[in-house]
Each structure stands twice: as structure tokens, then as C-alpha cells.
């Protein structure tokens, strides 16, 4: 029994993410990290709840970014095997 990735429900979405240019992934993630570091410089102007919210958003976004890179690398390897 052969398993086809195309039967996976999110295959097209993941394929689209994997087809993004590597530069755009780098640019997006580095820009986000830069904005977070700038927030760290001015965090005294935010309430503790605001700081906690922004830190939580940062951690969740970092996890998503790491998952995007893993997906990108896996599909890159799969694409290279198929050629």
C-alpha cells in the first residue's frame, strides 16, 4: 500500500510554504526578531500584562518559525529525491 503525501489534508498549504523563497523566510524571521529586541529596549513603557503578552507572542512565533524551517528542509529533501 503506497502512501501519497497529496492525500494529506494540508499538503497544498505545506507545499506552498515550502516553495517560498529562502530569502523571504530569512527576512521575515530576522525582521521579527529585530522588532522584538527593539521592544526589549522600550518594555518599561508597557504594563506587565502587555509585556507578558508580547513575550508569549514572540515565543509562539519562534516556534512557528522553527516549524516552517523544518517543513522547508523536509520538502526540499523530498523534492531533491524526486528529481
From Swiss-Prot:
**Broad class of the protein's primary localization:** membrane
| Compartments in which it is found | Cell membrane
Q: Which GO terms describe its cellular component?
A: plasma membrane
Q: Which UniProt keywords apply?
A: Cell membrane, Membrane, Transmembrane, Transmembrane helix
**What membrane topology is annotated for this entry?**
Multi-pass membrane protein
User: Where does the sequence pass through the membrane?
Assistant: 23-43, 56-76
Protein name as annotated? Uncharacterized membrane protein YoyJ
Source organism per UniProt: Bacillus subtilis (strain 168)
Amino acid at each position: 500500500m503506497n502512501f501519497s503525501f497529496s492525500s494529506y489534508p494540508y499538503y497544498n498549504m505545506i507545499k506552498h510554504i515550502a516553495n517560498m523563497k529562502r530569502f523571504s523566510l530569512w527576512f521575515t524571521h530576522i525582521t521579527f526578531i529585530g522588532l522584538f529586541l527593539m521592544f526589549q529596549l522600550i518594555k518599561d513603557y508597557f504594563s506587565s500584562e502587555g509585556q507578558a503578552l508580547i513575550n508569549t507572542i514572540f515565543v509562539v512565533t519562534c516556534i512557528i518559525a522553527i516549524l516552517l524551517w523544518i517543513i522547508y528542509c523536509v520538502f526540499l529533501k523530498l523534492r531533491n529525491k524526486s528529481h
